[in-house]
């Protein structure tokens, strides 16, 4: 059973774009959350779906691609090809932003901010 996110989901859009299969997937079921996909895969033998690495737990098995495991090290090195970066964007440079935006960027780059990112299971900005 092939499971996916609903049309319009950013996760679905990125997955289909990375694999160049936009509008070609026939899902047996479309779910409205990453947690829903994870839970359905975990409870349905023979199913497959896609989720973000940060939500993978011991209820499912993350698949290797071309023998490469989906680990932080492999993603950062570029050897695990099914990944996408996120960026934070502003209009202009950080120095041109208001104090709240400057504080946010400072926090993300601080040890405390990095600890939060790591605790969430996300990969630190490089």
Locate each region found by the language model.
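Exported/periplasmic ABC-transporter solute-binding proteins
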Residues: 1-126
């Amino acid at each position: 059973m092939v499971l996916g996110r609903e049309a319009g989901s950013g996760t679905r859009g990125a997955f289909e774009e990375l694999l160049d299969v936009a509008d070609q997937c026939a899902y047996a079921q479309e779910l409205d959350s990453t947690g829903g996909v994870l839970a359905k895969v975990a409870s349905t033998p023979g199913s497959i779906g896609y989720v973000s690495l940060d939500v993978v737990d011991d209820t499912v098995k993350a698949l290797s691609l071309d023998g490469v495991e989906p680990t932080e090290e492999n993603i950062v090195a570029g050897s695990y090809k099914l990944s996408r970066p996120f960026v934070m964007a502003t209009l202009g440079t950080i120095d041109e932003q208001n104090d709240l935006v400057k504080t946010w960027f400072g926090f993300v780059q601080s040890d405390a901010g990095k600890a939060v990112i790591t605790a969430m299971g996300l990969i630190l900005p490089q």
